[in-house]
């Protein structure tokens, strides 16, 4: 398929701007960087709650680091596989994907996501990646009705889970609860896919694919995770595979750094959970360079810790390879980036360390639970009387959705998922706390 079809935008543009020689993907990057949805990431939880410390990452700084790692991966692959330089294309494209990858995630991290998914359980569900797709293509007001109106290839690259929610959902897998406070995230995992409300955009993105490619690309299978009841997609595009690797590396390495600096992960935990696996790795570089890196990671000398972090990132970035799946005709689907097996295992060990000692830490879970309750409380309030409680512009969207017979509950999810942690907390106080002040300070943000 020619590259021009992947540079097409859903809504034709005739912008004649003076001396503007930017490529289509440079324009995409600019639209993402200058969007309100991207700015809001500065006040959304990454792993550690916003306000706990002024050192750790927010979703904004995480996204910037993912972008840097993503372009580093592309540069390495370009040198390692010169025959694939045309496929790698524009660095601006990969920057766009990495900068935008978390743009749809709601306030309070996973707690907010599970809460919205539960409140939307009869209305198509909620999932952060699906919301990212929706913001880029419909909600962000760069255009009247086409969101940021990004290139088709950019939209293909943001598709981490290329199948509709209804195709992936397995009914009867959720226990009913009688009280919101009893909601367990493990029992209500979001379906990882595109909302059915956005099927028109999904179809447009996949339009250039052959019938066989589309069928295979959107195929689903049972999940390999024992506690995940829904079906899962199997494939992603080449650009998406690079973005996802960059995200995984940033999560495993940089979120680990935050936890080390804040004293949440200790040297003894590293020696117990990570060092043995690295020392027995089948890769000699991992055995020699990473097995003893814990000394630097937990050093009180900041420059030694930063050197260790750099070594980890470099090790993973340079261990990425390109795989060929000839069952696909379209090169953007045929080729995918992945980590060499021993490095994939090492990265997984780091991710499990973060999950075990950071994500599952009771103090972190209490913050997540609190955010979960805030989001459900807000949704319940707005759903009870949308034309009374929603801000005026959101009321108008809700009314239009009702009049056109669309899913008006999706408008509520759009509004709440766009909030920052702080704004959602303040709005909750305004609605439910007798001691809260007036709504004046909230009005400008609505």
Swiss-Prot record:
Domain of life: Bacteria
Keyword Hydrolase among record annotations: yes
Pfam families attached to this UniProt entry: HD, HD_assoc
PROSITE patterns, A to Z: HD
HD domain span: 59-252
GO BP: dGTP catabolic process
InterPro entries named among the record's database cross-references: dGTPase (IPR006261), dGTPase-like (IPR050135), dNTPase_2 (IPR023023), HD/PDEase_dom (IPR003607), HD_domain (IPR006674), PHydrolase_assoc_dom (IPR026875)
Keyword DNA-binding: no
SUPFAM superfamilies: HD-domain/PDEase-like (SSF109604)
Region (Disordered): 1-28
Comp. bias intervals (Basic and acidic residues): 7-28
Annotated family: Belongs to the dGTPase family. Type 2 subfamily.
Protein name per UniProt: Deoxyguanosinetriphosphate triphosphohydrolase-like protein
Taxon lineage: Bacteria, Pseudomonadati, Pseudomonadota, Gammaproteobacteria, Alteromonadales
